[in-house]
Amino acid sequence: MRSKNISEVKKKIVVVDFGSQVTKLIARRIRELKIYCEVVNLKDFDKINDFSQIKGIILSGGPSTVTKKSYPKIRSDIFKKSIPILGICYGLQLITKFFGGKIKKTKKKREFGEATLIEKSNSVLFKNCYNQKRSKVWMSHQDAVFKLPKNFINIASTNNSKFTAIQHKTKKIYGIQFHPEVTHTEKGKEILNNFVSKICKIKKNWLLSLEKNRIIEDLKDKIKNKKVICALSGGVDSSVVAVLINNAIKKNL
């Protein structure tokens, strides 16, 4: 129930959803940093023409593999823009593939669980995250980068993945194989904060309380004096919708 007119004029981070089970966690972590963030599916992202208010793009993880002939791709024009980009898991592999690097299946069928991250280069993405050069991160992947793309450098490794984190030499394009959005990754939220605040340079512009008030006013404007029927399952989503509509139109619900 969001007004597109309002969201389009707000500076934001956009998360492109490639099907990861934890994609929405990325947006949640960024909103916890008081920065406005939207999750957009691939088809809707392809339709975006105006990027003026998009200050950063995050490519989520997902179940697909770039090693097949057909796989979900990201529109190529975003790499020609000056908008910072962070690829997470599958997002890293998309970036690597696009710029000419090589992706292969890992020796293990799938790497899932805790891994020790070893920093290889001082990167703003990891700034002030770790007192030591080693830290715990959470992996969930079956493909890995085996050859860096041209003009990229390696900024972190694990025992099972040489190129766990990479960045472009001149552009603000980053990729990480692990998941900073989950609590299992040490300083994961700080990594996301470095991306949105230090790299994207977006200022805090979102509060949950203000968002609630905005949605209620938006509902009032759209519904006016009409009657509304709300189907309530008892789950979180429908319950929140029911409360918001009730706050907006009272007896007309």
Predicted features along the sequence, with ranges:
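RNA-binding accessory domains that recognize and position tRNA/RNA substrates
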Residues: 1-59, 63-69, 79-81, 97-253
